[in-house]
Regions:
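Charged, gly/pro-rich active-site loop segments
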Residues: 1-11, 84-137
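Short, basic/aromatic recognition patches
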Residues: 2-28
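Short beta-strand segments
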Residues: 24-58, 66, 73-76, 86-88
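Short secondary-structure boundary/capping segments
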Residues: 18-19, 44, 64, 124-126
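A generic structural signal for nonpolar/aromatic side chains embedded in well-ordered alpha-helices
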Residues: 20-21, 66, 107, 136
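Structural motif corresponding to alpha-helix initiation and N-cap regions
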Residues: 14, 59-60, 117
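A short, polar/charged loop/turn motif at coil->beta-strand junctions and beta-hairpin connectors
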Residues: 20-23, 82, 130
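Short, surface-exposed beta-strand-loop junctions and turns on beta-sheet-rich folds
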Residues: 60-62, 81
Length: 137
């Protein structure tokens, strides 16, 4: 089994991973709800060099589920042929933060697009008062 440092080194240097991290593709996050049911949800994510990070409103059901069971898996993949696929498993930690965390803004940038980013960010900062910042290691 690889160590966390070895995994980080791979994620920070592999050209296929770099392609996926730069692509406008959400992660498909798999988790288990408190009643034991599996769920998959798309999330905009960020790799910070040591962990994957995403943010959600703290009242979303996925946050309660992750508190009850922090084990997750996710995939990021292309639809081209041949497909490029990154599959990750890990454990989450959750921090409630005031306002909109920069990680959320940066994670959303690839999906929203630079041409719409200024307006999107203004609206999000006006409407969101707190978020759950989720770190996957």
């Amino acid at each position: 089994m690889q160590t966390h440092d070895e995994i980080c080194d791979l994620l920070n240097t592999d050209p296929f991973v770099a392609q996926l991290l730069a692509a406008p593709i959400p992660a498909r996050l798999a988790y288990v709800t408190p009643d034991g049911e599996p769920r998959v949800a798309p999330v905009s994510y960020l790799w910070n060099g040591k962990a994957f990070v995403f943010a959600s409103p703290p009242h979303f059901s996925r946050i309660a589920a992750l508190r009850a069971n922090p084990n997750v898996a996710f995939t990021v993949d292309t639809t081209d042929f041949p497909p490029v696929v990154m599959m990750v498993r890990g454990s989450t930690s959750i921090e409630i933060v005031q306002g909109v965390p920069e990680e959320y803004v940066e994670a959303s940038r690839r999906i929203v697009g630079e041409d719409r980013m200024e307006n999107w960010e203004r609206i999000v900062r006006e409407e969101i008062k707190e978020m759950a910042l989720v770190t996957i290691t």
